[in-house]
């Protein structure tokens, strides 16, 4: 009796494997070779290609060393919080590695002088200033399908005005039009983005939901589709000013990883964005060095390997700026301790009751 049952189990497993082989060969005949495969058979699938954000702390907080390629990224926050700066820094980092980048300027507000100061190569940056939302997303789709673009930035979702709204009268009520436009575009784009390995960054603005009593009243524009399709969502906020005596020379900025499909989310990092310079790399080295225990802080003095960096944070930053070899050495040590620093970022962050993922139908 036991032998019969064993033979029955063996026969079933043989039948299953034959049926699976037949199904796979039929799929490949219908849709082409490579349309279905075992995940482990393609080693390239396991590797996550990334591009640096220009911020060492944010690269560590993202868990994979930067923003992932072949994915949709959303950067949102209040006005003048550093959204476009962060996107331009990512473009600059991609261009340093020989990447081709494009900027779809739906807001018609890109400052080329500021972009150059951030390290963007304007000669090799593709730029489009579309008239309508449909035109912007069609240009995005064409560039992504070409497979030649490494990073594409759309600035911003709120400025993607549907053609019907532009051609209509001022004050016309067209509820849900932009949300439908975004939903349709993302359905069409998502497969092309993955196949072409293009990183598409959508910059978004914040609106207030009406009549919210509990939780955050904030939401992002363009409906809910982008929240689902985005692999990484970054919430960027200005939390203070960087001053030199009485003059404001930059912003203290906090970025929270609200969503991350590549690594644990809810990590948050703080860094300085200096006017005309971008993310302060030396400031990050000092702050992250203290957090990781690589840079020692005794009172107001900062030191590294018994070498004094300076009294006060600004003096330590100046010392590292004047000594690039020492700055590189500290950066190398920080990258080796990335796991420890990432764990400490996770302790600082945490899921808010509502991280802007609420219903986007009622917007001010």
UniProtKB/Swiss-Prot annotation:
UniProt cross-references to InterPro entries, sorted A to Z: AAA+_ATPase, DNA_recomb/repair_RecA, DNA_recomb/repair_RecA_CS, P-loop_NTPase, RecA-like_C, RecA-like_N, RecA_ATP-bd, RecA_C_sf
Region annotation (Disordered) ranges: 343-364
MF GO annotations: ATP binding; ATP hydrolysis activity; ATP-dependent DNA damage sensor activity; damaged DNA binding; single-stranded DNA binding
Compartmental location: Cytoplasm
Positions that bind ATP: 77-84
A GO cellular component entry from the record: cytosol
Pfam families per the UniProt record, alphabetical: RecA, RecA_C
Keyword Protease part of the UniProt annotation: no
GO terms under biological process: DNA recombination; DNA repair; SOS response
Keywords attached to this entry: ATP-binding, Cytoplasm, DNA damage, DNA recombination, DNA repair, DNA-binding, Nucleotide-binding, SOS response
Gene3D superfamilies named in the record: P-loop containing nucleotide triphosphate hydrolases
Matching SMART domains: AAA (SM00382)
Biased composition (Acidic residues): 352-364
Keyword DNA repair listed: yes
Membership in a protein family: Belongs to the RecA family.
Record's function text: Can catalyze the hydrolysis of ATP in the presence of single-stranded DNA, the ATP-dependent uptake of single-stranded DNA by duplex DNA, and the ATP-dependent hybridization of homologous single-stranded DNAs. It interacts with LexA causing its activation and leading to its autocatalytic cleavage.
NCBIfam families: tigrfam_recA
Protein's recorded name: Protein RecA
Gene: recA
């Amino acid at each position: 009796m036991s032998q019969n049952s064993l033979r029955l189990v063996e026969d079933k497993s043989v039948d299953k494997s034959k049926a699976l082989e037949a199904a796979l060969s039929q799929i490949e005949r219908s849709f082409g070779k490579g349309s279905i495969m075992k995940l482990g058979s393609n080693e390239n699938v396991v590797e996550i290609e990334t591009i640096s954000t220009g911020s060492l702390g944010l690269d560590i907080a993202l868990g994979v060393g930067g923003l992932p390629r072949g994915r949709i990224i959303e950067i949102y926050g209040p006005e003048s919080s550093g959204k476009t700066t962060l996107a331009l820094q990512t473009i600059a980092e991609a261009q340093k590695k020989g990447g081709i980048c494009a900027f779809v300027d739906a807001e018609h507000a890109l400052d080329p002088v500021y972009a150059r100061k951030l390290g963007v190569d304007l000669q090799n940056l593709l730029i489009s200033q579309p008239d309508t939302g449909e035109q912007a997303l069609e240009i995005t789709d064409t560039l992504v399908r070409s497979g030649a673009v490494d990073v594409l930035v759309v600035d911003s979702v709120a400025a993607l005005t549907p053609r019907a709204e532009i051609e209509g009268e001022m004050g016309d009520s067209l509820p849900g039009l932009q949300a439908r436009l975004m939903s349709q575009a993302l359905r069409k784009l998502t497969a092309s983005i993955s196949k072409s390995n293009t990183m598409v960054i959508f910059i978004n603005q914040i609106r207030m939901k009406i009549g919210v009593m509990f939780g955050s009243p904030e939401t992002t524009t363009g409906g809910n589709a982008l929240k689902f399709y985005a692999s990484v969502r970054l919430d960027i906020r200005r939390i203070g000013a960087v001053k030199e005596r009485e003059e404001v020379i930059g912003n203290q900025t906090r970025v929270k990883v609200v969503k991350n499909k590549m690594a644990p989310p809810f990590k948050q990092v703080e860094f300085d964005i200096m006017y005309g310079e971008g993310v302060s790399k030396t400031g990050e080295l000092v702050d992250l060095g203290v957090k990781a225990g690589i840079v020692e802080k005794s009172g107001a003095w900062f030191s590294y390997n018994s070498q004094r960096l300076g009294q006060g944070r600004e003096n330590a930053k100046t010392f590292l700026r004047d000594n690039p070899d020492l700055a590189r050495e500290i950066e190398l040590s920080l990258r080796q301790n990335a796991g420890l620093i990432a764990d400490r970022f996770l302790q600082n962050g945490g899921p808010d009751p509502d991280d802007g993922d609420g219903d986007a139908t009622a917007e001010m």
